[in-house]
Amino acid sequence: MAFLPQRNFVEDILANNYNLNNGTTAFTSTNIAEYNTFSIQVNTTGLGGSNRFVLEQSNDGSNWIPINEDIYVLDLGSGTLSIQKADFSGKYLRVRLLDAGNGTITIILISKR
């Protein structure tokens, strides 16, 4: 029996075309604590400023804490963030925009099982 290599695949589109203003959030409804490994891809369009945002986690969907101290900047409007499983103890993830501006954001979970 041949073993197929494990590969990345798009598991869920967690948030699609959220309209964001300064300080607003897009968050998941999927319990991502169930995944073995994951990375997050964020695509933004039409946002003003430098597209800075932070990642936050929650166990209950209401009390949010930062995953780490990093502030992410997407100058080109999209990017893949490497979130290690060890860095994440919550069930839910959200992206909180720090810059003023309007636009949309899509969050995609890319997972290996």
List the predicted regions and their residue ranges.
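Solvent-exposed serine/threonine-rich low-complexity stretches and specific carbohydrate-binding patches
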Residues: 11-14, 66-76
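Transition segment at domain starts
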Residues: 1-35
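Edge beta-strands of jelly-roll/beta-sandwich modules across compartments, strongly enriched
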Residues: 101-113
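Conserved Ser/Thr-centered positions that define the repeating blades of beta-propeller domains
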Residues: 57-58
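Noncatalytic modules at the cell exterior or secretory-pathway interfaces
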Residues: 36-42, 86-104
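Exposed aromatic-hydrophobic patches
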Residues: 27-30, 79-86
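Aromatic, loop-rich ligand-recognition surfaces of beta-strand-rich domains
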Residues: 28-50, 109-111
